[in-house]
């Protein structure tokens, strides 16, 4: 059986927050604002995986109204979902993700992100692709107000 899922997430940039994208801390004057650590890439990936198994969305499992998830490490949330997915007999076919940000530039961190995501999903890094783009200064990401991410995942059983 093959299952496909897609995920999308966006978070606002804010001062006095640490910037974590793809499980990697990125030095920058702003970080992403959210109930958890606001890792926009891991949230999109988690949502894509949840979609692939037909189990709703990330908010169903980790609601932002639950204080148990306040400042939660998104890598731990992804690992929790992945444990359920593996228990159901699925494994990663491949994952393709895009980070959309004007600043900071993500390209220097993409390889580290790829390795961290592969580790979290018990996969080979060749099964994971992460890329970054801008919106040519258009929209909220172009105005440097936030960062968005898209992810598509293929699961095999």
Curated annotation (Swiss-Prot):
It catalyses: 4-CDP-2-C-methyl-D-erythritol 2-phosphate = 2-C-methyl-D-erythritol 2,4-cyclic diphosphate + CMP. Gene3D superfamilies: 2-C-methyl-D-erythritol 2,4-cyclodiphosphate synthase. A divalent metal cation binds at residues 9, 11, 43. InterPro entries: MECDP_synthase, MECDP_synthase_CS, MECDP_synthase_sf. The record marks 35, 134 as: Transition state stabilizer. One of its GO terms (biological process) is terpenoid biosynthetic process. 4-CDP-2-C-methyl-D-erythritol 2-phosphate binds at residues 9-11, 35-36, 57-59, 62-66, 101-107, 133-136, 140, 143. Binds 1 divalent metal cation per subunit. Its EC number is 4.6.1.12. Keywords: Isoprene biosynthesis, Lyase, Metal-binding. GO terms for molecular function: 2-C-methyl-D-erythritol 2,4-cyclodiphosphate synthase activity; metal ion binding. Pathway: Isoprenoid biosynthesis; isopentenyl diphosphate biosynthesis via DXP pathway; isopentenyl diphosphate from 1-deoxy-D-xylulose 5-phosphate: step 4/6. It is an enzyme of class 4 (lyase). Coiled coil: none annotated. PROSITE patterns: ISPF. The keyword Membrane does not apply. Its cofactor is a divalent metal cation. Involved in the biosynthesis of isopentenyl diphosphate (IPP) and dimethylallyl diphosphate (DMAPP), two major building blocks of isoprenoid compounds. Catalyzes the conversion of 4-diphosphocytidyl-2-C-methyl-D-erythritol 2-phosphate (CDP-ME2P) to 2-C-methyl-D-erythritol 2,4-cyclodiphosphate (ME-CPP) with a corresponding release of cytidine 5-monophosphate (CMP). Homotrimer. Belongs to the IspF family. This is 2-C-methyl-D-erythritol 2,4-cyclodiphosphate synthase. The gene is ispF.
């Amino acid at each position: 059986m093959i299952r496909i899922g897609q995920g999308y997430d966006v978070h606002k940039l804010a001062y006095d927050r640490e910037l974590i994208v793809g499980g990697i801390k990125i030095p920058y004057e702003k970080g992403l604002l959210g109930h958890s650590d606001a890792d926009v890439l891991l949230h999109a990936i988690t949502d894509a995986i949840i979609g692939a198994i037909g189990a709703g969305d990330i908010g169903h499992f980790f609601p932002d109204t639950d204080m148990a998830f306040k400042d939660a490490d998104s890598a731990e949330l992804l690992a929790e979902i992945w444990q359920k997915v593996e228990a159901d007999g699925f494994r990663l076919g491949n994952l393709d993700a895009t980070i959309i940000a004007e600043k900071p530039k993500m390209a220097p961190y993409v390889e580290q992100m790829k390795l961290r995501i592969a580790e979290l999903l018990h996969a080979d890094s060749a099964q994971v692709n992460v890329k970054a783009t801008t919106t040519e200064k258009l929209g909220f990401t172009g105005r440097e107000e936030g960062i968005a991410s898209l992810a598509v995942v293929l699961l095999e059983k």
